[in-house]
A protein has these predicted regions:
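Active-site anion-handling motifs in enzyme catalytic cores
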Residues: 1-181
C-alpha cells in the first residue's frame, strides 16, 4: 500500500480479493461435480514444487483417495475448470495447497485445509498474499507447521466469517464510492 501511495501520490485502499465477495452458496451455483468422486478424498493443489511435509500428512491418512490437481501424472484432473475446482474443494475431506485461491475457496466452503509455503523462485511474492489472507481472517493455524497433525481436520472459521462480512461491506462501500466519482 505504501509503495502504491508513493508511486501515484494518492491514498490506496486494500480490499478483499473479488473471489471473497461472493458467498459459498453463490459459488456452489457454478460448481460442477463431473470430476468429483463419490468416495472420500484428499485434494492436493500445488503451483510450486510439492513441499516437505505433504508426504507425512498423506502417510497419516492412508486409505483415502488422493486427487492431485496440476499433476502431470494424474491426467483426470489436469484440465478442470472453475466449476470443477470449486466442487472438488467443497467436497474434499482435506485440501493441501500452496495456492491463494485454493485457500480462499477452502475457507469460503468450510473445508479443512493446510497451506504450505510455495517453493518456487518465480512465485515468492505469492507467499505474502497467502500470509495476508491467513492473518486477515485469523487463520494462521491453517499454515503447515510441526503440530498440524493435531488440528488437521479442524474447520473453525466462525471468526473468519465475521471478519469476512466486514470485509465484504468495506469492499462494496469502496466500489460504490469509486463508481460514483
Amino acid at each position: 500500500m505504501e509503495i502504491i501511495q508513493e508511486l501515484i501520490a494518492a491514498d490506496a485502499k486494500r480490499v478483499v480479493d473479488p473471489t471473497l465477495v461472493l458467498t459459498a452458496d453463490e459459488w456452489r451455483k457454478i460448481s460442477d461435480s463431473s470430476y468429483t468422486p463419490q468416495e472420500e478424498y484428499i485434494l492436493t493443489y500445488f503451483l510450486g514444487e510439492q513441499p516437505n511435509g505433504v508426504k507425512a500428512i498423506l502417510d497419516k491418512v492412508q486409505g483415502v483417495k488422493i486427487i492431485a490437481i496440476n499433476n502431470l501424472f494424474q491426467d483426470d484432473y489436469s484440465e478442470i475448470g472453475p466449476g470443477e475446482f470449486v466442487d472438488l474443494i467443497d467436497h474434499a475431506k482435506l485440501i493441501l495447497t500452496d495456492s491463494f485461491h485454493a485457500s480462499v475457496f477452502s475457507m469460503l466452503l468450510n473445508s479443512a485445509f493446510v497451506v504450505f509455503d510455495r517453493h518456487d523462485d518465480r512465485y515468492t511474492t505469492m507467499n505474502s498474499r497467502i500470509e495476508n489472507l491467513l492473518c486477515t481472517f485469523q487463520l494462521e493455524d491453517r499454515k503447515y507447521d510441526e503440530k498440524i497433525m493435531e488440528r488437521l481436520y479442524e474447520k473453525n472459521y466462525k471468526k473468519a466469517y465475521t471478519i469476512l462480512e466486514k470485509e465484504r461491506a468495506s469492499f462494496m462501500s469502496f466500489l460504490n464510492k469509486t463508481l460514483k466519482q
